[in-house]
């Protein structure tokens, strides 16, 4: 049976410093993300009919997952899908402004890049407990949203363009309880070229 595996990061653990510190990145990737994968593989044991499905397919079609393992797949499959996506939209050469059609769409939808950042930051800062803030494409339109725990926008039929993990494990070593500071630091490492590519694929 095919196993889900931890993807390699496209940069070193210290590449996003000082914004995202080396120790947090290492623990986040090798411990937290890896645990979701271990638990997902355990949940899928004995379910050969799900073996060939990508994690994105699993979380996008939870109603097709047997009820006995649906919650485990939602939580751990969501954790795997969300983190796999997250690593790809971060870059040591990130920051700056959105590019291409995404830049135009953000301007049209939110009025300005600053207004978008404010709405995204609010989604992340006001998410009670653990969860994620997202910029998604929903029915062809950009939308800022948040999800609880490891729920994926894919489950709601939405396609992520950028996302930010606001679980404490993502920032506590460096930012303690200062979640807004962590959200502010995120803008220095967003890979807008990757986000533009995601937008092109989603719209």
From Swiss-Prot:
Reaction(s) the record says it catalyses: 2 superoxide + 2 H(+) = H2O2 + O2
UniProt keyword list: Manganese, Metal-binding, Oxidoreductase
Cofactor note: Binds 1 Mn(2+) ion per subunit.
Keyword Transferase assigned: no
EC number, as in UniProt: 1.15.1.1
Pfam families: Sod_Fe_C, Sod_Fe_N
Binding site for Mn(2+): 28, 83, 165, 169
Cofactor(s) needed for function: Mn(2+)
A single Gene Ontology CC term: cytoplasm
EC top class, as a word: oxidoreductase
GO molecular-function terms, A-Z: metal ion binding; superoxide dismutase activity
UniProt xrefs under PANTHER family: 37S RIBOSOMAL PROTEIN S26, MITOCHONDRIAL, SMALL RIBOSOMAL SUBUNIT PROTEIN MS42
Subunit structure: Homodimer.
Name of the protein this chain belongs to: Superoxide dismutase [Mn] 1
């Amino acid at each position: 049976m095919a196993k889900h595996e931890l993807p390699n990061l496209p940069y070193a653990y210290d590449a996003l410093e000082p914004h995202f510190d080396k120790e947090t990145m290492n623990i986040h990737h090798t411990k937290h993300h890896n645990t979701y994968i271990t638990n997902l593989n355990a949940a899928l044991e004995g379910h050969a009919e799900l073996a060939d499905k990508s994690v994105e397919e699993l979380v996008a079609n939870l109603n097709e997952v047997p009820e006995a393992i649906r919650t485990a797949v939602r939580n751990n499959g969501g954790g795997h899908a969300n983190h796999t996506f997250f690593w790809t939209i971060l870059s040591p050469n990130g920051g700056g402004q959105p590019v291409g059609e995404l830049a135009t769409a953000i301007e049209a939808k939110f009025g300005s890049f600053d207004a978008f950042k404010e709405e995204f930051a609010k989604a992340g800062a006001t998410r009670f407990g653990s969860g994620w803030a997202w910029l998604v494409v929903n029915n062809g339109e950009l939308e800022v949203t948040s999800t609880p725990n490891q729920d994926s926008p894919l489950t709601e039929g939405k396609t992520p363009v950028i996302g930010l993990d606001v679980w404490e494990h993502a920032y506590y070593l460096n930012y303690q309880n200062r979640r807004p500071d962590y959200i502010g630091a995120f803008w220095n490492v967003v890979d807008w070229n990757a986000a533009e590519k995601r937008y092109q694929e989603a719209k």
